[in-house]
Amino acid sequence: MKSIVSKAQQYLEQERNSRFSEEIKDFETPKIVVVGCGGSGNNTVHRLSNMNVSSAMTIAINTDKQQLLRTKADKRVLIGRSITRGLGAGGYPEIGRKAAELARNVLEDLLCDSDMVFVCAGMGGGTGTGSAPVVADVAKKQGAIVIGFAQMPFRVERARIQKALDGLEEMKEVCDTVVVLDNNKLLDYYPNLPIDAAFSVMDQLIAETIKGISDTITIPSLVNIDFADVKAIMGHGGVAVMLVGEAKAQDKANAVVRDCLSHPLLDVDYRGATGSLVHISGGHDLTLKEAEEIIRNLTFEIDDYANVIWGARIDKEFEGFVRVVSIMTGIKDRDFVGSLSYENVLQKQKLRDIRVESRNNGEKLRKQQSFSEPVKFRREKQKVSIPIIDRL
Protein backbone atom coordinates (compact mmCIF):
# COMPACT_ATOMS: atom_id res chain seq x y z
CA MET A 1 0.00 0.00 0.00
CA LYS A 2 2.86 2.39 0.83
CA SER A 3 4.38 1.90 -2.61
CA ILE A 4 1.09 2.81 -4.24
CA VAL A 5 0.88 6.00 -2.19
CA SER A 6 4.48 6.82 -3.04
CA LYS A 7 3.89 6.39 -6.76
CA ALA A 8 0.72 8.44 -6.57
CA GLN A 9 2.63 11.31 -5.00
CA GLN A 10 5.44 10.89 -7.51
CA TYR A 11 3.19 11.32 -10.52
CA LEU A 12 0.87 13.90 -8.96
CA GLU A 13 2.64 16.91 -10.45
CA GLN A 14 2.76 15.26 -13.86
CA GLU A 15 -0.97 14.57 -13.74
CA ARG A 16 -1.66 18.18 -12.81
CA ASN A 17 0.18 19.44 -15.87
CA SER A 18 -1.38 16.98 -18.31
CA ARG A 19 -4.88 16.63 -16.96
CA PHE A 20 -6.63 17.25 -20.28
CA SER A 21 -5.98 15.62 -23.60
CA GLU A 22 -6.15 17.62 -26.82
CA GLU A 23 -9.47 15.99 -27.60
CA ILE A 24 -11.04 17.16 -24.34
CA LYS A 25 -9.67 20.68 -24.83
CA ASP A 26 -11.81 20.98 -27.94
CA PHE A 27 -14.95 21.05 -25.79
CA GLU A 28 -16.21 24.47 -24.81
CA THR A 29 -16.14 25.52 -21.18
CA PRO A 30 -19.21 27.18 -19.66
CA LYS A 31 -19.45 30.89 -20.37
CA ILE A 32 -19.59 32.68 -17.02
CA VAL A 33 -20.30 36.40 -16.82
CA VAL A 34 -20.17 38.69 -13.79
CA VAL A 35 -22.19 41.91 -14.08
CA GLY A 36 -21.73 44.68 -11.52
CA CYS A 37 -24.62 47.16 -11.40
CA GLY A 38 -24.17 50.54 -9.76
CA GLY A 39 -21.42 51.62 -7.38
CA SER A 40 -21.36 48.53 -5.17
CA GLY A 41 -21.53 46.14 -8.11
CA ASN A 42 -18.77 48.05 -9.89
CA ASN A 43 -16.55 47.68 -6.83
CA THR A 44 -17.02 43.91 -6.89
CA VAL A 45 -16.20 43.70 -10.59
CA HIS A 46 -13.17 45.96 -10.08
CA ARG A 47 -11.81 43.62 -7.40
CA LEU A 48 -12.41 40.58 -9.58
CA SER A 49 -10.50 42.21 -12.41
CA ASN A 50 -7.59 43.00 -10.09
CA MET A 51 -7.54 39.33 -9.10
CA ASN A 52 -6.84 38.53 -12.76
CA VAL A 53 -9.82 36.19 -12.95
CA SER A 54 -9.73 34.32 -16.25
CA SER A 55 -12.69 32.02 -15.75
CA ALA A 56 -15.35 34.72 -16.14
CA MET A 57 -16.00 37.86 -18.18
CA THR A 58 -16.62 41.01 -16.14
CA ILE A 59 -19.08 43.75 -17.11
CA ALA A 60 -19.56 47.04 -15.26
CA ILE A 61 -22.84 48.93 -15.70
CA ASN A 62 -23.54 52.38 -14.31
CA THR A 63 -25.32 55.67 -14.91
CA ASP A 64 -22.38 57.53 -13.35
CA LYS A 65 -19.65 58.12 -15.94
CA GLN A 66 -16.95 59.01 -13.40
CA GLN A 67 -17.55 55.86 -11.35
CA LEU A 68 -17.47 53.78 -14.51
CA LEU A 69 -14.16 55.27 -15.65
CA ARG A 70 -12.60 54.27 -12.32
CA THR A 71 -13.81 50.68 -12.67
CA LYS A 72 -11.61 47.99 -14.20
CA ALA A 73 -13.65 45.47 -16.23
CA ASP A 74 -13.66 43.61 -19.54
CA LYS A 75 -16.68 45.66 -20.66
CA ARG A 76 -17.99 48.96 -19.33
CA VAL A 77 -21.46 50.19 -20.23
CA LEU A 78 -22.82 53.66 -19.51
CA ILE A 79 -26.61 53.39 -19.41
CA GLY A 80 -29.23 56.14 -19.32
CA ARG A 81 -27.05 58.68 -21.09
CA SER A 82 -30.10 60.58 -22.37
CA ILE A 83 -31.70 60.59 -18.91
CA THR A 84 -28.87 61.26 -16.48
CA ARG A 85 -26.21 62.72 -18.83
CA GLY A 86 -23.72 60.43 -17.09
CA LEU A 87 -24.26 62.03 -13.68
CA GLY A 88 -25.90 59.10 -11.88
CA ALA A 89 -29.42 58.16 -10.84
CA GLY A 90 -29.52 60.34 -7.73
CA GLY A 91 -30.66 57.48 -5.52
CA TYR A 92 -33.88 56.92 -7.49
CA PRO A 93 -34.36 53.24 -8.49
CA GLU A 94 -36.96 54.17 -11.10
CA ILE A 95 -34.28 56.13 -13.00
CA GLY A 96 -31.87 53.20 -12.82
CA ARG A 97 -34.60 50.86 -14.04
CA LYS A 98 -35.54 53.09 -16.97
CA ALA A 99 -31.87 53.51 -17.93
CA ALA A 100 -31.42 49.73 -18.03
CA GLU A 101 -34.60 49.25 -20.04
CA LEU A 102 -33.36 51.70 -22.65
CA ALA A 103 -30.14 49.67 -22.90
CA ARG A 104 -31.88 46.28 -23.09
CA ASN A 105 -30.67 45.61 -26.64
CA VAL A 106 -27.07 46.28 -25.61
CA LEU A 107 -27.44 43.99 -22.60
CA GLU A 108 -28.88 41.22 -24.76
CA ASP A 109 -25.83 41.34 -27.03
CA LEU A 110 -23.42 41.27 -24.09
CA LEU A 111 -25.13 38.36 -22.34
CA CYS A 112 -25.78 36.30 -25.46
CA ASP A 113 -24.85 32.59 -25.09
CA SER A 114 -24.04 32.95 -21.39
CA ASP A 115 -24.37 29.81 -19.28
CA MET A 116 -24.13 31.42 -15.84
CA VAL A 117 -24.51 35.09 -14.94
CA PHE A 118 -23.71 36.61 -11.56
CA VAL A 119 -25.54 39.91 -11.02
CA CYS A 120 -24.00 41.95 -8.19
CA ALA A 121 -25.58 45.09 -6.78
CA GLY A 122 -26.04 47.05 -3.61
CA MET A 123 -29.69 47.45 -2.69
CA GLY A 124 -31.08 50.83 -1.63
CA GLY A 125 -29.44 53.16 -4.15
CA GLY A 126 -30.57 54.23 -7.59
CA THR A 127 -28.61 52.48 -10.34
CA GLY A 128 -27.97 49.15 -8.61
CA THR A 129 -31.46 48.73 -7.17
CA GLY A 130 -33.16 49.73 -10.41
CA SER A 131 -30.95 48.14 -13.06
CA ALA A 132 -30.00 44.80 -11.45
CA PRO A 133 -33.46 43.20 -11.86
CA VAL A 134 -33.51 44.29 -15.52
CA VAL A 135 -30.06 42.78 -16.14
CA ALA A 136 -31.11 39.57 -14.40
CA ASP A 137 -34.27 39.40 -16.50
CA VAL A 138 -32.27 39.82 -19.72
CA ALA A 139 -29.83 37.08 -18.69
CA LYS A 140 -32.68 34.77 -17.70
CA LYS A 141 -34.38 35.19 -21.06
CA GLN A 142 -31.05 34.37 -22.74
CA GLY A 143 -31.21 30.96 -21.06
CA ALA A 144 -28.54 31.50 -18.40
CA ILE A 145 -28.57 30.45 -14.77
CA VAL A 146 -28.82 33.77 -12.91
CA ILE A 147 -27.33 34.16 -9.44
CA GLY A 148 -27.86 37.48 -7.73
CA PHE A 149 -25.69 38.92 -4.97
CA ALA A 150 -27.77 41.53 -3.12
CA GLN A 151 -25.85 43.65 -0.64
CA MET A 152 -28.24 45.18 1.91
CA PRO A 153 -27.64 48.61 3.51
CA PHE A 154 -26.52 49.46 7.02
CA ARG A 155 -29.13 50.38 9.61
CA VAL A 156 -27.81 53.95 9.65
CA GLU A 157 -28.71 54.33 5.96
CA ARG A 158 -32.35 54.90 6.88
CA ALA A 159 -33.57 56.31 3.57
CA ARG A 160 -32.26 53.28 1.68
CA ILE A 161 -33.92 50.52 3.71
CA GLN A 162 -37.39 50.40 2.16
CA LYS A 163 -35.96 50.86 -1.34
CA ALA A 164 -33.55 47.99 -0.63
CA LEU A 165 -36.35 45.67 0.49
CA ASP A 166 -38.38 46.52 -2.62
CA GLY A 167 -35.35 45.92 -4.83
CA LEU A 168 -34.70 42.57 -3.15
CA GLU A 169 -38.25 41.44 -3.90
CA GLU A 170 -37.71 42.28 -7.58
CA MET A 171 -34.43 40.35 -7.61
CA LYS A 172 -36.15 37.30 -6.11
CA GLU A 173 -38.69 37.33 -8.93
CA VAL A 174 -36.15 37.23 -11.79
CA CYS A 175 -33.08 35.42 -10.37
CA ASP A 176 -32.77 31.67 -9.97
CA THR A 177 -30.95 32.21 -6.68
CA VAL A 178 -30.36 35.39 -4.67
CA VAL A 179 -27.55 35.41 -2.14
CA VAL A 180 -28.56 38.03 0.43
CA LEU A 181 -25.71 39.75 2.27
CA ASP A 182 -26.44 41.94 5.29
CA ASN A 183 -23.83 44.65 5.85
CA ASN A 184 -25.00 44.96 9.45
CA LYS A 185 -23.57 41.53 10.25
CA LEU A 186 -20.06 42.83 9.59
CA LEU A 187 -20.60 45.62 12.11
CA ASP A 188 -21.97 43.08 14.59
CA TYR A 189 -18.89 40.88 14.20
CA TYR A 190 -16.39 43.75 13.92
CA PRO A 191 -17.91 46.74 15.75
CA ASN A 192 -14.76 48.86 15.46
CA LEU A 193 -14.55 48.49 11.70
CA PRO A 194 -15.17 51.79 9.84
CA ILE A 195 -18.10 51.77 7.43
CA ASP A 196 -15.91 52.25 4.36
CA ALA A 197 -13.74 49.33 5.48
CA ALA A 198 -16.87 47.21 6.01
CA PHE A 199 -17.96 47.94 2.44
CA SER A 200 -14.51 46.91 1.26
CA VAL A 201 -14.62 43.64 3.21
CA MET A 202 -18.01 42.70 1.75
CA ASP A 203 -16.83 43.50 -1.79
CA GLN A 204 -13.80 41.28 -1.23
CA LEU A 205 -15.96 38.42 0.09
CA ILE A 206 -18.27 38.53 -2.91
CA ALA A 207 -15.40 38.75 -5.38
CA GLU A 208 -13.48 35.84 -3.86
CA THR A 209 -16.63 33.70 -3.67
CA ILE A 210 -17.46 34.25 -7.34
CA LYS A 211 -13.84 33.67 -8.36
CA GLY A 212 -13.67 30.48 -6.31
CA ILE A 213 -16.85 29.05 -7.86
CA SER A 214 -15.90 30.09 -11.40
CA ASP A 215 -12.35 28.76 -11.15
CA THR A 216 -13.48 25.44 -9.70
CA ILE A 217 -15.92 24.98 -12.59
CA THR A 218 -13.58 25.94 -15.42
CA ILE A 219 -10.02 25.38 -14.16
CA PRO A 220 -8.58 22.02 -13.04
CA SER A 221 -8.69 21.83 -9.24
CA LEU A 222 -8.19 19.20 -6.57
CA VAL A 223 -11.95 18.54 -6.62
CA ASN A 224 -13.83 20.24 -9.44
CA ILE A 225 -17.43 21.43 -9.24
CA ASP A 226 -19.43 20.19 -12.19
CA PHE A 227 -21.42 22.91 -13.96
CA ALA A 228 -24.46 20.64 -14.21
CA ASP A 229 -24.43 20.16 -10.42
CA VAL A 230 -24.20 23.91 -9.85
CA LYS A 231 -27.11 24.35 -12.22
CA ALA A 232 -29.14 21.77 -10.30
CA ILE A 233 -28.59 23.56 -6.99
CA MET A 234 -28.73 27.17 -8.14
CA GLY A 235 -31.40 26.69 -10.81
CA HIS A 236 -34.22 26.79 -8.26
CA GLY A 237 -32.34 27.88 -5.17
CA GLY A 238 -34.58 30.79 -4.23
CA VAL A 239 -33.05 32.71 -1.35
CA ALA A 240 -29.56 31.76 -0.19
CA VAL A 241 -27.24 32.62 2.67
CA MET A 242 -23.45 32.69 2.50
CA LEU A 243 -21.23 31.34 5.28
CA VAL A 244 -17.54 32.22 5.35
CA GLY A 245 -14.83 30.91 7.65
CA GLU A 246 -11.06 30.65 8.00
CA ALA A 247 -8.81 28.72 10.36
CA LYS A 248 -5.09 28.29 10.94
CA ALA A 249 -5.27 26.01 13.96
CA GLN A 250 -3.91 22.48 14.02
CA ASP A 251 -7.48 21.21 14.20
CA LYS A 252 -8.43 23.47 11.30
CA ALA A 253 -11.23 21.23 9.96
CA ASN A 254 -13.37 21.77 13.07
CA ALA A 255 -12.14 25.31 13.64
CA VAL A 256 -13.14 26.51 10.18
CA VAL A 257 -16.64 25.03 10.54
CA ARG A 258 -17.10 26.81 13.87
CA ASP A 259 -15.96 30.04 12.23
CA CYS A 260 -18.44 29.55 9.37
CA LEU A 261 -21.42 28.79 11.58
CA SER A 262 -20.70 31.71 13.91
CA HIS A 263 -20.38 34.25 11.08
CA PRO A 264 -23.40 33.93 8.77
CA LEU A 265 -23.92 36.99 6.56
CA LEU A 266 -27.70 36.78 6.96
CA ASP A 267 -29.52 36.00 10.20
CA VAL A 268 -31.91 33.29 8.99
CA ASP A 269 -32.52 29.67 9.93
CA TYR A 270 -30.69 27.70 7.24
CA ARG A 271 -31.13 24.30 8.89
CA GLY A 272 -33.83 23.36 6.40
CA ALA A 273 -31.80 24.38 3.34
CA THR A 274 -32.43 22.20 0.30
CA GLY A 275 -29.02 22.70 -1.30
CA SER A 276 -25.47 23.51 -0.34
CA LEU A 277 -22.52 24.56 -2.46
CA VAL A 278 -19.25 24.36 -0.53
CA HIS A 279 -15.89 25.60 -1.78
CA ILE A 280 -12.70 24.80 0.15
CA SER A 281 -9.37 26.54 -0.41
CA GLY A 282 -6.27 25.12 1.23
CA GLY A 283 -2.58 24.45 0.87
CA HIS A 284 -0.87 21.22 -0.10
CA ASP A 285 -1.23 20.11 3.51
CA LEU A 286 -5.03 19.87 3.13
CA THR A 287 -6.01 16.21 3.47
CA LEU A 288 -8.99 14.35 2.07
CA LYS A 289 -10.07 13.49 5.62
CA GLU A 290 -10.11 17.17 6.58
CA ALA A 291 -12.14 18.10 3.50
CA GLU A 292 -14.69 15.35 4.18
CA GLU A 293 -14.93 16.37 7.84
CA ILE A 294 -15.57 19.99 6.87
CA ILE A 295 -18.39 19.03 4.50
CA ARG A 296 -19.99 16.63 6.98
CA ASN A 297 -19.99 19.05 9.91
CA LEU A 298 -21.04 22.05 7.84
CA THR A 299 -24.08 20.31 6.33
CA PHE A 300 -25.06 18.29 9.40
CA GLU A 301 -28.27 20.20 10.17
CA ILE A 302 -29.63 20.86 6.68
CA ASP A 303 -32.35 18.80 4.99
CA ASP A 304 -31.62 15.05 4.88
CA TYR A 305 -32.28 15.01 1.14
CA ALA A 306 -30.44 18.24 0.37
CA ASN A 307 -28.28 18.35 -2.73
CA VAL A 308 -24.72 18.95 -1.51
CA ILE A 309 -21.81 19.58 -3.88
CA TRP A 310 -18.33 20.68 -3.02
CA GLY A 311 -15.08 21.62 -4.63
CA ALA A 312 -11.55 22.06 -3.34
CA ARG A 313 -8.72 24.16 -4.68
CA ILE A 314 -5.06 23.89 -3.71
CA ASP A 315 -3.12 27.14 -3.61
CA LYS A 316 0.29 27.82 -2.13
CA GLU A 317 -1.09 31.04 -0.62
CA PHE A 318 -3.18 28.89 1.74
CA GLU A 319 -0.33 26.85 3.19
CA GLY A 320 -1.06 26.24 6.88
CA PHE A 321 -4.66 27.39 6.85
CA VAL A 322 -7.97 26.75 5.13
CA ARG A 323 -10.84 28.94 3.92
CA VAL A 324 -14.40 27.72 3.39
CA VAL A 325 -17.23 29.49 1.58
CA SER A 326 -20.64 27.84 1.64
CA ILE A 327 -23.84 28.95 -0.07
CA MET A 328 -26.98 27.43 1.46
CA THR A 329 -29.93 27.57 -0.95
CA GLY A 330 -33.66 27.07 -0.56
CA ILE A 331 -33.89 28.95 2.74
CA LYS A 332 -37.39 28.59 4.16
CA ASP A 333 -37.33 31.65 6.41
CA ARG A 334 -38.88 34.42 4.31
CA ASP A 335 -39.08 37.07 7.03
CA PHE A 336 -36.37 39.30 5.61
CA VAL A 337 -37.38 42.37 7.57
CA GLY A 338 -36.63 40.48 10.77
CA SER A 339 -33.55 38.74 9.46
CA LEU A 340 -32.04 41.95 8.14
CA SER A 341 -32.13 43.67 11.54
CA TYR A 342 -34.33 46.51 10.33
CA GLU A 343 -37.26 46.10 12.76
CA ASN A 344 -36.40 49.05 14.99
CA VAL A 345 -35.57 51.36 12.10
CA LEU A 346 -38.72 50.51 10.17
CA GLN A 347 -40.85 50.77 13.32
CA LYS A 348 -39.45 54.25 14.02
CA GLN A 349 -40.08 55.27 10.42
CA LYS A 350 -43.64 53.96 10.66
CA LEU A 351 -44.29 55.90 13.86
CA ARG A 352 -42.75 59.00 12.32
CA ASP A 353 -44.99 58.63 9.25
CA ILE A 354 -48.02 58.26 11.51
CA ARG A 355 -47.06 61.43 13.41
CA VAL A 356 -46.50 63.34 10.18
CA GLU A 357 -49.83 62.15 8.80
CA SER A 358 -51.58 63.05 12.05
CA ARG A 359 -49.98 66.52 12.03
CA ASN A 360 -50.98 67.07 8.40
CA ASN A 361 -54.53 65.97 9.10
CA GLY A 362 -54.65 68.35 12.07
CA GLU A 363 -53.48 71.24 9.92
CA LYS A 364 -56.11 70.44 7.29
CA LEU A 365 -58.78 70.33 9.96
CA ARG A 366 -57.70 73.69 11.37
CA LYS A 367 -57.76 75.22 7.90
CA GLN A 368 -61.27 73.94 7.34
CA GLN A 369 -62.38 75.42 10.64
CA SER A 370 -60.70 78.81 10.12
CA PHE A 371 -62.50 81.75 8.52
CA SER A 372 -61.10 84.02 5.89
CA GLU A 373 -63.01 87.09 7.15
CA PRO A 374 -64.71 88.03 10.39
CA VAL A 375 -68.25 86.84 10.78
CA LYS A 376 -70.91 89.26 11.90
CA PHE A 377 -73.38 87.75 14.26
CA ARG A 378 -76.90 89.19 14.13
CA ARG A 379 -79.34 88.84 16.89
CA GLU A 380 -82.63 87.89 15.44
CA LYS A 381 -85.59 89.98 16.46
CA GLN A 382 -88.04 87.88 18.27
CA LYS A 383 -91.66 88.73 18.56
CA VAL A 384 -92.59 88.73 22.19
CA SER A 385 -96.23 88.35 23.01
CA ILE A 386 -97.17 90.75 25.78
CA PRO A 387 -100.30 89.83 27.63
CA ILE A 388 -102.99 92.48 27.44
CA ILE A 389 -104.27 93.55 30.80
CA ASP A 390 -107.77 94.95 30.68
CA ARG A 391 -108.17 98.20 32.40
CA LEU A 392 -110.58 98.20 35.17
Curated annotation (Swiss-Prot):
InterPro entries: Cell_div_FtsZ (IPR000158), Cell_div_FtsZ_CS (IPR020805), FtsZ/CetZ (IPR045061), FtsZ_C (IPR024757), Tub_FtsZ_C (IPR008280), Tubulin/FtsZ_2-layer-sand-dom (IPR018316), Tubulin/FtsZ_GTPase_sf (IPR036525), Tubulin_FtsZ_GTPase (IPR003008)
Keyword Metal-binding: no
One BP annotation, GO: FtsZ-dependent cytokinesis
Compartment(s) of residence: Cytoplasm
Signal sequence segment: none
Keyword annotations from UniProtKB, A to Z: Cell cycle, Cell division, Cytoplasm, GTP-binding, Nucleotide-binding, Septation
Entry binding sites for GTP: G126, T127, G128, E157, R160, D203
Cellular component GO terms, alphabetical: cell division site; cytoplasm
Pfam families: FtsZ_C, Tubulin
MF annotations from Gene Ontology: GTP binding; GTPase activity
Family, similarity comment: Belongs to the FtsZ family.
Record's function text: Essential cell division protein that forms a contractile ring structure (Z ring) at the future cell division site. The regulation of the ring assembly controls the timing and the location of cell division. One of the functions of the FtsZ ring is to recruit other cell division proteins to the septum to produce a new cell wall between the dividing cells. Binds GTP and shows GTPase activity.
Subunit and partners: Homodimer. Polymerizes to form a dynamic ring structure in a strictly GTP-dependent manner. Interacts directly with several other division proteins.
HAMAP family with a match to the protein in the record: FtsZ
Protein name, per record: Cell division protein FtsZ 2
Gene that this sequence comes from: ftsZ2
